[in-house]
A protein has these predicted regions:
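Flexible, compositionally biased loop and terminal segments
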Residues: 4-222
Length: 222
């Protein structure tokens, strides 16, 4: 399925389109923890592609005011890829226009399991009481505690599932499914997705009156 893998052009267009739309935070599922089950050739392609795109795109991200934030696990991640991600984070650290969350070697269940493990360790060490654990406690132990809750989750390629992506952060996300493969999803398609999202009524589990006037004023798209 190499033909369905991303291209640098598609990545550039979507990031640029998000900046133009005023999106404050964009999360990209670059490589999942489940992707290690792919063939060695596919893994090499995805790792190499991510490294190449980061190296080539960092200057553009700096110019656009985009700050890179890596989200994921360290084990098994190629050292050269991790080095490139850290480099992009350092170079773009002062940018404030938009945050680009690079979800690399990431899995939603893995994130929650890692958070639970860290919390259990604090309880065992006597630094935290089990009765004091709240949703805020869990959030503080996620890979990127300051990440915004997701407003809009876009899935390309004709699949209608979220594939273990940002399970905690996307609890109340609006879903948008596109039949187009990722390489063909550009800024125009992004605009259409955001336009569809803008026409929806979000309730966050409550009645309309309960959330009237309390909708988020900043967008987070994945």
């Amino acid at each position: 399925d190499l033909h369905s893998f991303p291209t640098r052009r598609s990545s550039d267009l979507v990031v640029a389109g998000a900046v133009e739309l005023g999106v404050r935070e964009l999360s990209v599922y670059a490589f999942s923890t489940e992707n290690w089950r792919r063939s060695p050739a596919e893994v090499r392609f995805l790792m190499g592609f991510t490294r190449t795109v980061l190296r080539a795109q960092t200057d553009d991200l700096l110019e656009w005011g985009v700050r890179v934030n890596w989200v994921g696990r360290t084990p098994r991640l190629w050292k050269s890829v991790l080095s490139e991600v850290r480099r992009s984070e350092r170079i773009t650290a002062g940018n404030e226009t938009m945050v680009l969350n690079m979800c690399l070697n990431y899995g939603g269940r893995a994130e929650i399991a890692d958070a639970a493990r860290a919390i259990a360790g604090e309880v065992a060490a006597g630094r935290l009481k089990a009765s004091a654990i709240t949703e805020a406690t869990i959030r503080r132990h996620l890979y990127s505690p300051t990440m915004r809750d997701v407003d809009l989750l876009i899935r390309t390629g004709g699949e209608q599932r979220t594939s273990n992506f940002l399970i905690w952060e996307a609890a109340y996300a609006e879903l948008y499914f596109s039949a187009l493969p990722w390489p063909e999803f550009d800024r125009v398609q992004l605009w259409r997705a955001v336009e569809a999202y803008a026409g929806r009524e979000r309730r966050f589990g409550g009645a309309v009156d309960a959330v009237d006037g309390q909708l988020p004023d900043r967008k987070s798209v994945v």
